Amino acid sequence: MNRTRTATVAASVAWVLAATWLQLMRGPGLRAYDVVWAEDGGVFLNQAMRHSLWHNLVTPHAGYLQVIAKLIAQPVAALPLAWAAAALATGAALVVALISLLVWFHSGRVLRSPWARVLVTAVVPLLPQAGFEVNAAVNDLHWYLAYAAFWVLVAPPRSVAGQVGSAAVVALAALSDPLTALVLPAAIVGIVRSPRRLLACVTPAVMLVALAVQGWVHLTRAAGYRASETVLGELPSIYGLRVLLSALTGDRLLGPVYQWAGLVLVAVVGAVAALVAGFLLWRADRVGRQVAAVGLVCSVAYLVVPVGLRGTGGFLERAEFSLNGSRYTIVPLLLLWVAVAALLDRLRPRTVVGGVVAVFLSVQVLSDWAAPSVRTGGPSWRASVAEARAACSAPARPSQPAPLVAEEDGRYAVPIVPGPDDVTIVVAPVPPPGEPLLFAVVAPCAEVRG
């Protein structure tokens, strides 16, 4: 192994470890490694504790297979229960770090400036808006896999081995979330630019097969879900607020700014962004124009379609503004930064352009890094397991509550009702007093004691 390759491997390992650690340490209060989040424990860990990997892989949750979450949760179930929070969070953070490394290598095929490649790479684990809801959460890895799929499609490898690896990435992404289909337009750019167009068609073809499997599962085994009605006219405003304005302010300032200026500011920001994007698209070279255009198209689609399916209720509340639903903005924001990087990639002086972008994003990251998240208030997994152990040792154990969310969602849902030798361990978010329990891990006392 020559020195260059050795340095590359060493730098890659160092980055993955650093990016993983940063995600685990993000936010105030309790850290991600001591809090089990919602479906991570209430669905996927419960499944892994009760069924085989194959059973879990073919059982949908919330309308899709969520393969990546189940691949992580299954080995976690074999560990001591007290390790579950740390193992789930570390697994999720490691996957995100590896995706960022993949982006670094693929982006070199379409971006020339080192700062542009650093931007689209570092924003994966450090995205300011990821801290509130999706940081180090197994349940939300499918958003990051969609971003990975975008990159392997827009910048396809030229070797057979590279195509095999890319096919594995898009298959995992598509089998985790059917919405990954929204990044398929990137394949057009990748195929047109590739000197080996037939080979470049392999990865999109594999993705279509995986999406067909997801479609069959969704049609035959999934139940529909809608949180609210969809008002189509609100979707542009939601994109302007939660993506464009959020990209300028970060999460911590978004609420105060929106409450102060309302949709008028959102409209102004949207109009200015459209004018600037049009000018930069006109000035950009062919590669930058293609990558930026497909990035913007996929960014808008990845907000409009998921939110349209979920319902638009709550996103534009001004007086009681909330960051709830920020998971729907992760892919749109990541792809928006791809467009920014592609449009500014060739501008000179590159050092100045890259420095301005780096300072701008660094201020956001530092501002949002300590912002509260859905995990900040716990409950602490270590403390909860200790309480469960004490409850299992008590001579008279009170009846245990049954979580409302089943381990298997959809038409084949199987609610978990605690047995006489089971204990219920509540996970985040804890419901308000008087509200039914949503998410919990139901574990046998024999496993809790062990």
Q: What does each of the following model-derived ranges do?
A:
Residues 141-143, 316-345:
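Hydrophobic/aromatic-rich transmembrane helices and adjacent perimembrane loops
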Residues 130-149:
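Multi-pass, polyprenyl lipid-linked donor-dependent membrane glycosyltransferases
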Residues 153-158, 187, 275-281, 334-346:
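Alpha-helical transmembrane segments in multipass membrane proteins, preferentially the mid-helix core
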Residues 168-189:
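Transmembrane helices and adjacent periplasmic/lumenal helix-loop junctions
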Residues 149-165:
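Membrane-interface transmembrane helices that cradle and orient dolichyl/undecaprenyl
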Residues 17, 285-316:
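Transmembrane alpha-helix segments characteristic
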Residues 2-50, 54-131, 160-161, 189-191, ...:
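Intrinsically disordered, polar/acidic, low-complexity terminal segments
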